C-alpha cells in the first residue's frame, strides 16, 4: 500500500512504462505482489515492460506468487517481460538501451551472474544506468563485491551524479573498485540506520562503517531514508525520508521529505561514523 500510494502521486494515468525487479529477495519483490489487503504494483498499475533477473535460487512462496502475478499481467494485456540478460543481448524483443524521452535513456549493464551461478542471491541483481544528457545515475540492486568487480570489468562505466548504494550500505557492497570508477557525487541509501535487526555490532549496522569510510572519499552527499527508533511506531522514523533526485538536464537537485541535510551531518553519523575507522 505504501509503495502504490507513493507511485500514484507521480503516475496519474495508471500506466508504468517500465518496471524493474532487481532480484528475488523479499524486500525487492514483495511490493510487486501486494497482500490480501492491498494490491501490489503488478495489479495496481498497467506495467507495459517488466524487466527482472535472469537467475535466482529462490523457491519461496513469495517468489512463486511474484511469478504468478507477473505472468498474469503479461497474459492480461500488452505487457511484455524480459530478463536483464535479454536486454543486454538485444534478444527476444528486448533492448539494451531504451529511449525514455529526448536525451534520456535507460541502459542495461552486464555482469557475469546473469549467466553464472552465484553463492549469494544478491549477486543476481539487475544493474542499469540512467543517462540524462551528461548526467549519469547508477543502480545496482544488492550487488556485492564479486558482482561489482564483474560490472567494472564488463562495462565502460562513466562518472555518476548519483549512485543508489548497493545492498543498503552493507560492508560487502559499494566497494573501492566500483567507487573509483564512478566517482559518485550523490549516494542514496535505502536502510533503517542503526537498526540491530541483523547485528549488534555498531560498526556493521546499516549503513556500515566500511561503507561510510569508502564513500566519504568521494562525497559527503550521502542520504539515508530512515532511522531506527525504540519509541517510534514500527521502531523507525524518517531520517532523510523519501529522497527525490531531480534534474532538468543540468544541475542535479536533492529534495527530501525528511531532513534535507546529508546523513554526514546527522547526530548519528557524527557519533558513530565520523572519526571512526573500520578495523
Where are the predicted features?
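Internal alpha/beta domain cores that form substrate/cofactor-binding pockets in large enzymes
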Residues: 58-63, 69, 73-80, 151, ...
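Divalent cation-coordinating acidic motifs and surrounding scaffolds
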Residues: 20-22, 28, 53-65, 76, ...
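Short, solvent-exposed loop/turn and secondary-structure capping segments
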Residues: 30-34, 62-64, 141, 175-176
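Charged helix-capping and loop-helix junction motifs
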Residues: 34-38, 123, 204-208
